[in-house]
Each structure stands twice: as structure tokens, then as C-alpha cells.
Design a protein with these regions (language model features):
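Glycine-enriched alpha-helix->loop->beta-strand junction motifs that scaffold or abut catalytic
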Residues: 43, 73-75, 91-100, 119
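Conserved phosphate/oxyanion-binding catalytic-loop motifs
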Residues: 79
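Conserved N-terminal beta1-alpha1 strand-loop-helix module at the mouth
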Residues: 1-75, 83-87
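Glycine-rich phosphate-binding active-site loops on the catalytic face of alpha/beta enzymes
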Residues: 83, 91-115
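Broad structural signal for hydrophobic residues in well-ordered alpha-helices, predominantly aliphatic
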Residues: 69, 116-119
Length: 119
């Protein structure tokens, strides 16, 4: 049987953790690094950080936030949102992300084709 894991997912907008229902009535709920550390202290096995507006706003990734997360959190974490090119994936992984999450087929085939030989 596979191990059960607790993996909180934090939605990020403008560098802050936000909460809403179906992306409506979004409220700022705090610093993503502090909240991630709290989840880690409470026993989370991993974390997922999703930049919920990066793709829609066609802006670049939050690499500086990824570096802060990597420096302050001692459990694996995944980054998603706005990853469209191989260079995006590489920058996030080099900044300290353990995993990346991609959501579009074009991104998947482009990035998977590049990284498949490393698997």
C-alpha cells in the first residue's frame, strides 16, 4: 500500500498566499514562507505553491520566492503556474524547487521531452 501523505496547496498571487472559492472573493492570508513553515511544523509531508495568476497575466515566475522557500522550509515542495518553457522549469528547479507542476499539454510535451532523458 502506498504511504498516505499530507500535501497542503497554497495559492499565490502577487507574492502572497491567498484563499478564495472558485477564485472569487480572494483574500490575502499571509506570507507563503511563514505559512509553509507552519504547515511543515504541523507535519505536512510536502507543499505545493501555485501562482494562480502567472499564466493569465503572462508574467514571469516568482523565482525569488522559490529561493526564500528553499532556504526556510525543510520538506519537498512543488511550484506551479506560468511554466511555459524549458527555461522556466530549469530556473525554478535551480532556485530550489523539488518539483514543478505544469497544466497545459503544450508545456508538458515541451518540458517532458527535454527532461525525459534524465529519468
Amino acid at each position: 500500500m502506498l504511504a498516505k501523505r499530507i500535501i497542503p496547496c497554497l495559492d499565490i498571487r502577487d507574492g502572497q498566499t491567498v484563499k478564495g472559492i472558485n477564485f472569487l472573493n480572494i483574500k490575502n492570508v499571509g506570507d507563503p514562507v511563514e505559512l509553509g513553515a507552519e504547515y511543515s511544523n504541523q507535519g505536512a509531508d510536502e507543499l505545493v505553491y501555485l501562482d494562480i495568476t502567472a499564466s493569465h497575466e503572462e508574467r514571469k515566475l516568482f523565482v525569488n520566492l522559490v529561493k526564500r522557500i528553499a532556504q526556510n522550509i525543510n520538506i519537498p515542495f512543488t511550484i506551479g503556474g506560468g511554466i511555459n518553457e524549458i527555461s522556466d522549469a530549469e530556473r525554478l528547479l535551480n532556485a530550489g524547487a523539488d518539483k514543478i507542476s505544469i497544466n497545459s499539454a503544450s508545456s508538458f510535451y515541451s518540458i517532458y521531452g527535454f527532461f525525459a532523458w534524465k529519468i
